Amino acid sequence: MIVTIDGVAASGKSSVASGVARALGVPYVSSGLLYRAATLLGQDAGLDLTDQASLLAYLRDHPLRLEPLAEGNRVWQGQRDLTPELHSSAVDQGVSQVAAHPEVRAWVDDQLRALTPPFVAEGRDMGTNVFPHAPAKFYLTASPRVRAERRSRERPEAVEAIEAALIQRDALDTTQSAPAPDARVIDTGPLTLEQVIVAITSQLPSQ
């Protein structure tokens, strides 16, 4: 079975997907890490992130490998583990540009669809585009302020600056991030992580 968990930036997708995957005893797949890795490689190479052709050519010459694990995904480029570098502010600022490229999205989608179920997939369009026939779809949301306060606990930045960046990111991601018609929408704002995980696992179809 494939479970999809989509949602806005900093809505808790990765933590929730990891928790649901552990509860089910299956891997979880973070599509966002592939976009972040593509952004990081493009920035390291000095590429114009708005140049889809150059970015795609570079990615094909420097293949990425997603390692899906229940406790947390890792992304490799050759022997280099990119994972520790993927959540910097610089990557945050560039990832929406990269994710907006249709051919880059197709490149990511192909890698995800090549994975063998069962797994929990989290991202922006897992339930709408990548795995539209998944039997269990969820969409996480929360106010920009709540999301900014959560993210401020992970990095030394002012809540106001993070909130402004998230609002901008939401506007850029509107076309990519929308709940599937058959997705269950969960506002994570008033809930603990464990409560969100239970809310999802309690609604899963019988295996």
Swiss-Prot record:
BP-aspect Gene Ontology terms: pyrimidine nucleotide metabolic process
E.C. number: 2.7.4.25
Keywords carried by this UniProt record: ATP-binding, Cytoplasm, Kinase, Nucleotide-binding, Transferase
Subcellular location: Cytoplasm
Pfam families linked: Cytidylate_kin
Binding site for ATP: G7, V8, A9, A10, S11, G12, K13, S14, S15
Known catalytic reactions: CMP + ATP = CDP + ADP; dCMP + ATP = dCDP + ADP
Record's GO cellular component terms: cytoplasm
GO molecular function, one term: ATP binding
Main localization, broad class: cytoplasm
Broad enzyme group: transferase
Family listed: Belongs to the cytidylate kinase family. Type 1 subfamily.
Name this polypeptide is given: Cytidylate kinase
Organism for this UniProt entry: Deinococcus deserti (strain DSM 17065 / CIP 109153 / LMG 22923 / VCD115)
